[in-house]
């Protein structure tokens, strides 16, 4: 259990517990940036212009609605850091995608500090449609990222639990084996992992530095 409540703990099926890291703004950060700032629906086209990973000097804090994991701070706010006269549209778009990945990494670090061994992760939903974002997440986390067939994460998971509860499956594991299908796996690249590790260590310093100003 997490004594600081950086992760949320829930009773799960079969007497187990579910630990959840909750970001209040993840894919919605990209939607806000594209819709409200860039005024475009061409999400894929904007991302196609990003060609170099791991070297962006612009950082983005993904706290549009405050943040839960790991900060539990409703007053936290989003911010761009590191811009100059040379900063491009593509670099800021990339910073948004990377900022969300760094936020996910924050929860991963809490879990690891609790002694939880994590070797790979699964992804679904709107963000899973972006090859670039999946690649960034894999390298920021240094994990294999499995993309599952269903785009509906919470709803699909609830349906699986209901099927187990109704006796359609013997247990959760057998239901998942039957109903959750991996359609793609994105693997981290050692060179990019090293670059993103350096950038993540910088990212971690920005929230504590700005906390008193939010």
For each of these PLM feature ranges, what is it?
Residues 1-214:
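Active-site core segments that coordinate phosphate-bearing ligands/cofactors
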């Amino acid at each position: 259990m997490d004594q600081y409540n950086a992760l949320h703990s829930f009773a799960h099926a079969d007497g187990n517990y579910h630990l959840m890291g909750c970001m209040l703004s993840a894919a919605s950060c990209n939607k806000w940036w594209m819709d409200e700032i860039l005024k475009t629906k061409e999400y894929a086209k904007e991302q196609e212009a990003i060609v170099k990973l791991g070297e962006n000097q612009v950082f983005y804090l993904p706290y549009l609605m405050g943040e839960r994991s790991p900060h539990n701070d409703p007053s936290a706010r989003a911010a761009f850091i590191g811009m100059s006269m040379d900063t491009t549209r593509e670099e800021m778009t990339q910073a948004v995608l990377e900022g969300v990945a760094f936020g996910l990494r924050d929860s991963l670090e809490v879990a690891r500090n609790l002694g939880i061994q994590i070797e790979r992760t699964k992804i679904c939903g709107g963000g899973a449609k972006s090859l670039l974002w999946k690649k960034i997440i894999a390298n920021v986390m240094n994990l294999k990222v499995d993309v599952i067939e269903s785009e509906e994460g919470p709803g699909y998971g609830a349906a699986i639990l209901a099927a187990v509860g109704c006796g359609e499956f013997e247990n959760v594991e057998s239901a998942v084996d039957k109903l959750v299908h991996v359609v793609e796996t994105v693997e981290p690249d050692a060179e990019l992992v090293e670059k993103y590790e350096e950038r993540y260590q910088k990212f971690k310093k920005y929230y504590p530095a700005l906390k008193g100003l939010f």
